[in-house]
Amino acid sequence: MPNVLEEVPRPGRVAIVRLRSLGDCVLSTPALALLKRARADLRVAVVAEARFHALFEHNPDVDDILRPDPRVLRRWRPDLCLNLHGGTRSAFLTLVSGARWRAGFGHFRYQFAYNVHIPRAQEILGAERTVHTAEHLASAIFYLGAPVQEIPRARLGATGQPPPARPYAVLHAVATAPEKTWRADGFLEVARHIEESGLEAVFIGAAGDDLRPFSRHRIVQGAPLGQVKTLLAGASLFVGNDSGPAHMAAAFGLPSVVIFGPSDPAIWAPWRARSEVVKVPGGMAEVTVAQVVNALVRLRVSA
């Protein structure tokens, strides 16, 4: 493997392009930690949409957060630009970044945008198996020259808050697609079980989500990501569909029960967090309340 990181000047500047997807942004943070471990002198910028900037704030592995504007990126003057997204816009940003080294995975489109072509994660890790998204993203850092090692948990920085007056669990009962969304009455039954254990059930969702079925419980809706980070950082438990907030919860080491539809848990399960995955062959419609409650019991979380 080439050792690009050894060739980058000291001190050097590395821009990481990570557009779109809450979960992917969270799961890119182990790669950022590995990069800083390998070269503590590097100044690292993350290029991301404004709505995701809060995910990278207060992270000691991130020095700058840039909006995805070619002029902004060129003015930042990266020595190395690594694309962890792979779409058209991210390829263009990488191409015009002005970086001497422009790196992207070999399966990305627009290979002309890159002069460092990263092979499959399985080849880098020496493991012919399905790899988790965190492993896939981290493998790019290994290929660039960081020592291959255990990949850490995702990392989100949050401002310190006093302990809550009452311990609580966060429930995320919505998702981006119907086939990834468990039924509302199931979540209500699970919330009842959680409250019987002594935890308050707090439901979260985006501004456009329909949270009316959960109105008897505390609801945090449309909150900025920074506030959601703080809420998760202070929680005792997370229960939710396979979605971005589940990865945020795992980044805080929150014991989690995650209900899966069509996605593969080998790729998308909570990374390095105490968790239980509930997935059945028939999809979300076949998941029972008993299965989710039994997963909660196995986690042994209570007030």
Task: Give the predicted meaning of each segment.
Residues 1-303:
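Catalytic machinery of carbohydrate-active enzymes
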